[in-house]
Amino acid sequence: MAAYDLIQTDAELAHMTARLRDAGVKRLAIDVEGENNLHRYGIHVALIQLFDGARGYIVDPLSLRDTNSLKPLLENAPWELIWFDAGNDLLSFQHAMGIKPSPIVDLVVAARLLGKNGGLHDLTGEGGSARAKDRFQRANWLRRPLTAPLLDYAISDVLHLHELQDSLMAELEQKGLAEAFRVKNLQTQNAERVWDPYANYTRISGFKGLSREDRESARVLWYARELYGQAHDMPPGNVASKQEMRMIIDKGIRSADQIAAFLNENRSRNRVVPADLSRCFTEAEKQVPQA
């Protein structure tokens, strides 16, 4: 395991960025631990892991006074940001912080062009049990302090990206795919990533087969769930799962009080406050476009 510095203040971040710049670093491996409606509402950048080829850095964005201080590190940076599968991380930066990292090198784009369909650990040969990886990935990365095993896991994903980049770029050149990679990689970097949680109401099971009236009720229910989740900083799935929403629709339950009673019937945790849910339904009915 490579040594790493834990960056927890704006001053430490500025010092690290200046040190990397002064050292003439040209490539910086990067990965992000994020949260998307798992333990709290919405999209969050919880941790940023970096490796310059010799030393690792873990930046805690939750401890920064101003996340704009990340921009000299990530936006129009003087180094390539080496990622493996950057899409979700770029979405998180864009919507949680208003940051659009560049220039990036997304190694998953290179791997797919070469017909390599494995994940990062498959391509680097770095093993580990699937159960352990799943446990770490589902950990609450927003909780502080983070344990040493979590920090060690986090930094491990960036330690082999330089070597993987060298290998994949050489193979792209050999097979005449370097220009195709350049184009696709730039598309990945510059894509405008839209996150609109209100637009996903069609994910309710069997939505398209519902009657027009039930589709309208389902949409209001989805909006109200999102509003309640925002108000209580609660993942929408903990307010009402898609299965529960379909049951509410099928049972013809329409009033907020009845819906709250249905959701709370067998719950000891994540109980819904009827009055708050009622306010969310009132607001949802105003927001849902009329058919």
Predicted regions and their residues:
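Catalytic-core regions built around general acid/base machinery
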Residues: 16-19, 68-78
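N-terminal accessory regions of nucleic-acid-interacting proteins
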Residues: 1-28, 32
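Short active-site-proximal "capping" loops at secondary-structure junctions
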Residues: 33-38, 64
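Active-site-proximal helix-loop-helix substrate-binding element of RNase H-like nuclease domains
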Residues: 6, 49, 54-69, 79-162, ...
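Short, surface-exposed beta-edge/turn micro-motifs
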Residues: 25, 44-45, 78-79
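Short, solvent-exposed polar/charged micro-motifs at secondary-structure junctions
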Residues: 37-41, 114, 143-146, 248
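Accessory DNA-binding and partner-docking regions appended to nucleic-acid-acting proteins
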Residues: 148, 164, 168-291
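A short alpha/beta connector and helix-capping loop motif
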Residues: 38-54
